[in-house]
Amino acid sequence: MKKLAFVLALSGAFVSTSALAWGPDGHRAVGAIADKLIKGTNAEKHVKELLQPGESLEGVANWPDCVKGNYCGPQSPEMVEYVNANPKHQEYHYTDVPFQFDHYHDGDVGTADDDIVQTLKQAIAVLQGKDTPQTNPHHFTRRQALILITHMTGDIHQPLHVGAAYVSKDGTFVVPKKHGDIDAVGIFDSRGGNNFLVDDAKIEKLALANDIPPGEPKPEKPGVPKNLTKPFHSYWDGTTVNYAFRRLRTKTPDQFAQTVIASHPAVTMNTGDVSTWPYQWADDTLIYSKQAYADVTVGPLTPQVSKKGETYYTWTMEVPANYPVPSSAIAKNQLIKGGYHLAALLEAIWP
């Protein structure tokens, strides 16, 4: 593909690996699709029993992200209790398998006991009634398990929440063979792509040049300077979803859900025991992780200092000139799969 080189200005901002996969609209879209697909089923009956009056899968889809801070509003007692009982809850949202891999295997480099595949497997077991210290080490309640499944099924379909990029000082992608290889000397963890910085404004220009319809003007906060760059992870979390919505001429998650369901998408459904489905989803997402990193170019390492005085490293990133088109197409398809797979999982648990 023809490439357009970006000269990227470095941002001093630091974003954690546990960034909000798909962003609020993406997660709500996954939940909205599932809400519509399970309507009138036994699964819907059980979902309603676990949710509070007026709640829906769309409405609770962002709950596991909202517990990370106050950006959704004040923390509820339920959120505080969950956070206190799950000190590693931010690690539940992703796994860091090298994107060059084809499969997720327990114990491989980048996997962890508290990663997204293990969390989904545990939450599924809880809804199946398999609540033992071995199957439910975090003591998730049935309501928590449902909410986590709703959210994590979205997360696991986000390419950068499964396939991780490891990089050398000069910006070469490398594949660590074991956890100890990632030593921040020869091999660096890009933190889910958060330490790769892309030029936000230039990518938007590329989107418009590739006939992606213009979006709504972004509100600016008085006195707050606009960041010139954004993490590559944030691009995949939010920008690709925004482009996907714009390409379908939809503005809300519900509109997106209605539009894609009406198109009767061909979605490959999972087979086998539902406890294996998170593994199948991770393997499938690795296909798109490879595509996310295809034809991008990473510059040399640049040291940065966080507000806490900690040193971390960033790399500038160049993307192909048409990158907004394939990346937003991937986002659309992954959101659709997330919604359909969530509905199928709930119906498999509650036939």
PLM feature segments, named:
Residues 16-18:
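N-terminal signal peptide c-region/cleavage motif recognized by signal peptidases
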